[in-house]
UniProtKB/Swiss-Prot annotation:
PANTHER family: 60S RIBOSOMAL PROTEIN L35/50S RIBOSOMAL PROTEIN L29 (PTHR10916), LARGE RIBOSOMAL SUBUNIT PROTEIN UL29C (PTHR10916:SF0). This is Large ribosomal subunit protein uL29. One of its GO terms (biological process) is translation. One of its GO terms (cellular component) is cytosolic large ribosomal subunit. The keyword Acetylation does not apply. Pfam families: Ribosomal_L29. It comes from Caldicellulosiruptor bescii (strain ATCC BAA-1888 / DSM 6725 / KCTC 15123 / Z-1320) (Anaerocellum thermophilum). InterPro entries: Ribosomal_protein_uL29, Ribosomal_uL29, Ribosomal_uL29_CS, Ribosomal_uL29_sf. It comes from the Bacteria. Disulfide bonds: none annotated. Keywords: Ribonucleoprotein, Ribosomal protein. One of its GO terms (molecular function) is structural constituent of ribosome.
Amino acid sequence: MKASKIREMTTQELHNELKKLKRELFNLRFQLATNQLENPMRIREVKRTIARIKTIMRERELEQERANKNVK
């Protein structure tokens, strides 16, 4: 998933997507361990998407903190 598409999502949607991707990553790792995984590149894609989501969530936290500092 592209970062621009992730940025369009709300915070709640990001949390839901993060949960879904973590569940998928768990299942992919399980499939890898049992030699049932068809596309090993999917693990890499999911891990990178999780990292993108976490990065954008952190950016939003920092923006909120900066906004709160400027108000005081």
